[in-house]
Design a protein with these regions (language model features):
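Short, flexible, mixed-charge glycine/proline-rich loop motifs
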Residues: 1-9, 39-44
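General structural signal for secondary-structure boundaries
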Residues: 21, 42, 51, 86-87
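Intrinsically disordered, low-complexity segments enriched in small/polar residues
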Residues: 31-33, 56, 65, 83, ...
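Post-HEXXH active-site segment of zinc metalloproteases
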Residues: 41, 70-76
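Short Cys/His-centered divalent metal-binding micro-motifs
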Residues: 46-72
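Hydrophobic transmembrane alpha-helix bundles
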Residues: 2, 63-67, 99-100
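Short flanking/linker segments adjacent to small metal-binding domains or redox-active Cys/His motifs
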Residues: 74-100
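Histidine-centered nuclease catalytic patch
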Residues: 14-46, 60-64
């Protein structure tokens, strides 16, 4: 498993910033579906989120709120492009879409 290039600290939620004492933290592959989960793993494009509140079930979680999901994808795309020296076109050629 590749390390996240987004977060070194796995004990704090990427969205709310609170620590794991609130609830367990889960790994979230930012880009998923159609083989993109494996690409997220390969390039370290994953964040750590409170499993229920911020990841899966909360009204502002990445899996329930399209706006939050899109904002996380845009932020991570910027970081990945800077880290790997990709252009927008190169990012699209790998992940199939521009989130900026």
């Amino acid at each position: 498993m590749a390390k996240s290039i987004i977060q070194e600290d796995k004990s704090h939620c990427f969205l709310c910033g609170m620590n794991e004492n609130l609830e367990p933290i889960a790994e979230h592959h930012v880009f998923f579906g159609a083989g993109r989960r494996k690409l997220s793993e390969k390039y370290g494009l994953k964040v750590y989120l409170h499993n229920n509140k911020c990841h899966i079930f909360g009204k502002n979680s990445v899996h329930q709120n399209a706006g939050v999901d899109r904002a996380v994808k845009a932020a991570v795309q910027k970081i990945a492009m800077r880290k790997y020296g990709w252009t927008v076109e190169q990012f699209i050629s790998i992940f199939g879409k521009n989130y900026l």
